[in-house]
Amino acid sequence: MNQTLLSSFGTPFERVELALDALREGRGVMVLDDEDRENEGDMIFPAETMTVEQMALTIRHGSGIVCLCITEDRRKQLDLPMMVQNNTSAYGTGFTVTIEAAEGVTTGVSAADRVTTVRAAIADGAKPSDLNRPGHVFPLRAQAGGVLTRGGHTEATIDLMTLAGFKPAGVLCELTNDNGTMARAPECIAFAGQHNMAVVTIEDLVAYRLAHERKVS
């Protein structure tokens, strides 16, 4: 990742701390992965606090595939089957079947409806009957161990939410350019600046976790 582009956001450790502060303040974070991986930036928000306005921003500027990152325990609690039994996608992204809140939504497409679906899925006592399938929110099952196991946006989202003190659940969507192409690091960083988002890389998060968990052990 081009460190010159990221230098205005601090050192790798500072970027993680600023990202955690942003999440606690109810703001979004732009998470970048490696240039030799997907080379994309994902907007992420805590599932607990994401607003309708933030969802609308995500839908307007993102790929349209609004994903809810969850743990395996939550997937089992909601009885969500994986989308396919044999995952042959390039990076093994853990899609489950799509979901919609069973109550409180109309078509499920609007920003408000998608927030309602997210809240229904992460509620403490959520049960399978609280959700209809299919729907317009795409759950992603994170790998246990987070970014130390798999360097994906899904795992980064769960790790960041956990470190920030939230439930291990977050919403992500890939940033796209106005012409429909995928936004790369320069566009992602510019967008983050325009929308008061922190910027962090998965590489930053790996280093942060390794350092902090080494201290604990």
UniProtKB/Swiss-Prot annotation:
EC top class named in words: lyase
Pathway, per record: Cofactor biosynthesis; riboflavin biosynthesis; 2-hydroxy-3-oxobutyl phosphate from D-ribulose 5-phosphate: step 1/1
InterPro entries in the cross-refs: DHBP_synth_RibB-like_a/b_dom, DHBP_synthase_RibB
Binding residue positions for D-ribulose 5-phosphate: 37-38, 42, 150-154, 174
Annotated residues for binding of Mg(2+) 1: 38
Transmembrane segments: none
Keywords: Lyase, Magnesium, Manganese, Metal-binding, Riboflavin biosynthesis
Needed co-factor(s): Mg(2+); Mn(2+)
Free-text function comment from the UniProt entry: Catalyzes the conversion of D-ribulose 5-phosphate to formate and 3,4-dihydroxy-2-butanone 4-phosphate.
Record HAMAP family: RibB (MF_00180)
NCBIfam families: ribB
Family label: Belongs to the DHBP synthase family.
Record's subunit section: Homodimer.
Name the record gives this protein: 3,4-dihydroxy-2-butanone 4-phosphate synthase
